[in-house]
Amino acid sequence: MLNTLLTHLINPLAYIVPVLLAVAFLTLLERKVLGYMQLRKGPNIVGPYGLLQPIADGVKLFIKEPIRPSTASPTLFLVTPMLALTLAMTLWAPMPMPHPIIDLNLGVLFILALSSLAVYSILGSGWASNSKYALIGALRAVAQTISYEVSLGLILRSIIIFWGGYTVQTFNTTQEALWLLLPACPLAAMWYISTLAETNRAPFDLTEGESELAPGFNVEYAGGPFALLFLAEYANILLMNTLSAILFLGASHMPAIPELTTINLMTKAALLSVVFLWVRASYPRFRYDQLMHLVWKNFLPLTLALVLWHTALPIAFAGLPPQL
């Protein structure tokens, strides 16, 4: 009984609570970074240096009255934000930090499959709102996410050829001698840009378009359901950056000081997340046709060529003697 309680309740909570705390402070960091890049302070009133601002925001959102449009689908309208957050939390299960909560043989495919399911929560929330603005925003979001998942899948295919397995832990063994960032530099650049688009971040934030007159699929949401969608979005940002660090930025295991494994991975993921915020502060929004042109006419041919190259190269050199 105690063992079941530990594995089914305490272990998942030990993952979920720190992720949600990290999400809360990522929002504060984003507002601070944007503030300083626009020559102002950012939040600095609530608590010392504004550190309690995310908690105040969370409490404010969850005690607001949940307004549901009278014409909206009652069940789907509330289920889709919960689905979005559930998927965002489940995605962390196979991540080696340094040990995964579930040890899957096909961890990479699990992450790819579940991140694809997030499309349904976006489409469902846009459709259930029964608003033309929400539906148009949802359709744009779905088209963008599906398009960039193609390039993400092909880039992962190439990296899997590099490390020779679908288990996320095998990256440690592969990258002990050399970070994959160096031999797979074009892949890393395309992967990072694709994760920006996949998580609907600037300059690819056409789905939300906060500065526009009507934002995207979440236009009808307020209070608690909006907070759930918001948490899911930022949890996905942290997940994608942690995955980028795992794939390209070397083994998190340090043989000399094994205690620093988690800190090593967290530092790399945090630095990649800060670059996400820098990009948001620096670049204007893409036009929709440019967004699609980038993935279908630039990334897709290049990733296909690299998949063929990485498949053919080991076979071509297999006949050479090892001492060469």
Swiss-Prot record:
PROSITE patterns from the UniProt entry = COMPLEX1_ND1_1, COMPLEX1_ND1_2
What keywords is this UniProt entry annotated with? Electron transport, Membrane, Mitochondrion, Mitochondrion inner membrane, NAD, Respiratory chain, Translocase, Transmembrane, Transmembrane helix, Transport, Ubiquinone
| A GO molecular-function descriptor | NADH dehydrogenase (ubiquinone) activity
Entry membrane topology: Multi-pass membrane protein
Tell me the leader sequence span: none
User: Transmembrane ranges?
Assistant: 9-29, 76-96, 106-126, 146-166, 177-197, 228-248, 259-279, 299-319
Q: Where is this protein localized, as stated in its record?
A: Mitochondrion inner membrane
| The keyword Iron-sulfur appears for this protein | no
User: Which chemical reaction does it catalyze?
Assistant: a ubiquinone + NADH + 5 H(+)(in) = a ubiquinol + NAD(+) + 4 H(+)(out)
Instruction: Name any one Pfam family assigned in the record.
Output: NADHdh
Q: Name one GO cellular component term.
A: mitochondrial inner membrane
Q: What is its EC number?
A: 7.1.1.2
Q: List the disulfide bonds.
A: none
Report if keyword Transport is assigned.
Answer: yes
Q: Name one GO biological process term.
A: aerobic respiration
Job of this protein = Core subunit of the mitochondrial membrane respiratory chain NADH dehydrogenase (Complex I) that is believed to belong to the minimal assembly required for catalysis. Complex I functions in the transfer of electrons from NADH to the respiratory chain. The immediate electron acceptor for the enzyme is believed to be ubiquinone.
Name the protein family: Belongs to the complex I subunit 1 family.
Q: Which HAMAP family match?
A: NDH1_NuoH
Q: What is this protein called?
A: NADH-ubiquinone oxidoreductase chain 1
